[in-house]
UniProtKB/Swiss-Prot annotation:
SUPFAM superfamilies named among the record's database cross-references: Mog1p/PsbP-like (SSF55724)
A GO CC term attached to the entry: photosystem II oxygen evolving complex
Key words, A-Z: Chloroplast, Plastid, Thylakoid, Transit peptide
Protein name: PsbP-like protein 1, chloroplastic
Source species of the chain: Arabidopsis thaliana
InterPro entries per record: Mog1/PsbP_a/b/a-sand, PsbP_C
Coarse class of the protein's main subcellular location: plastid
Effect of gene knockout: No visible phenotype.
Designated gene of the protein: PPL1
Keyword Transit peptide: yes
Family to which this protein belongs: Belongs to the PsbP family.
Function text: Required for efficient repair of photodamaged PSII, but not tightly associated with the complex.
Amino acid sequence: MASLKLSPSSPISISKVGVIPSSKKGLSFLVKAEHHSSSSSSHLQDKCQRRLIVTFGVVAPWISLLSRAPLSFAAESKKGFLAVSDNKDAYAFLYPFGWQEVVIEGQDKVYKDVIEPLESVSVNLVPTSKQTIKEFGPPKQIAETLIKKVLAPPNQKTTLIDASEHDVDGKTYYQFEFTVQARNYTRHALGTITVFNGNFYTLTTGANERRWEKMKDRLHTVVDSFKITV
């Protein structure tokens, strides 16, 4: 990953993202936790968190079985993976062969392993007036806010492991790694976010901590494969 590059913080206004463990439908996330900052910027970051909470409360529904229009599928582009390309929303990514599509209200696309429900990938889009991801702030700040406010339940402990910035084809992406500790398991996860054409894109993927060493290379492939296609 590229080294962390900081930029001025700014209020975030994005929607709730994620997946909640279910016996049949696998994973979906909701989050809450504290966002720590220096005293000199506490007022601005408090405002940022309030906007997050308000927006999340409006947009975040739970799992449903509503039908969704399918994305177009490309041929397998890497051994052990299948490719998905959404022409309407202009993004593409790879997911491990054998994962199945599930429908979760509020998520644009979700694939999961039917045997290991914590192994999944989801993509979420919400409107934004920002032009680039950098306008929201530096990678670590934005990742911590997303993890604590969006990507884990409020009763679970979250830990940000790493956050970085990289550019691909002139577009800036933030990538981050984190864990979410529940009572009976810990999920080790990866995420990538970017802004394009009035949308804030979030892709998250992960696995049970006990399977992290086995799955981490595949999950990094998933995160690294996410690209805006325009």
